């Protein structure tokens, strides 16, 4: 579309789709089947794998919201078959957390969720509307976080956890099996 802005140094698969009013920065990589619907902003050292779909007004790969960040090299990796809905924000890592934010495969990020710097998210995770994750959060596979919940920084949520809506997660929630 004529209204999109794609930096000449971005690596875009011929099988990716970029809709109107999208911005794709110079160090961005978009794989086969990635679809930016419209009004999507992607920058930084961001790599998005196959068949991920991103909806309007998502902001991906912008500078971390951390006062210690001093423009050091960092990255954001988003796996395959993710759905990133409207107004979602995802930040890359910081030096204090290994400089990487990593998102697995087959995840759903609903409207207005926020994935802060240095988060590690497994596969098949669902994060409902208006859920912010603080920095350095780890979410293992097959987790569901209900709407309007909040997850404090440096928290770990174990596989198969189901967190009800409007929950404040202040401590680690690890998977345990019944005895």
State the predicted function of each range.
Residues 1-174:
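Structural signal for interior beta-strand "rungs" in well-ordered beta-sheet cores
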């Amino acid at each position: 579309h004529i209204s999109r802005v794609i930096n000449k140094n971005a690596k875009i698969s011929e099988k990716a789709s970029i809709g109107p009013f999208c911005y794709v920065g110079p160090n961005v990589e978009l794989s086969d089947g990635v679809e930016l619907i419209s009004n999507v902003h992607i920058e930084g050292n961001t790599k998005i794998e196959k068949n991920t779909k991103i909806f309007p007004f998502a902001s991906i790969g912008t500078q971390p919201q951390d006062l210690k960040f001093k423009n050091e090299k960092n990255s954001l990796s988003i796996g395959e078959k993710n759905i990133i809905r409207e107004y979602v924000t995802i930040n890359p890592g910081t030096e204090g957390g290994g400089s990487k934010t990593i998102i697995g495969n087959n995840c759903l990020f609903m409207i207005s969720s926020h994935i802060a710097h240095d988060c590690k998210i497994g596969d098949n995770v669902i994060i409902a509307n208006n859920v912010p994750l603080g920095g350095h959060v780890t979410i293992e596979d097959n987790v569901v976080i209900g709407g309007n919940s909040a997850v404090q920084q440096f928290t770990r949520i174990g596989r198969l956890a189901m967190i009800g809506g409007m929950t404040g997660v202040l401590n680690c929630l690890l998977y345990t099996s019944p005895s």
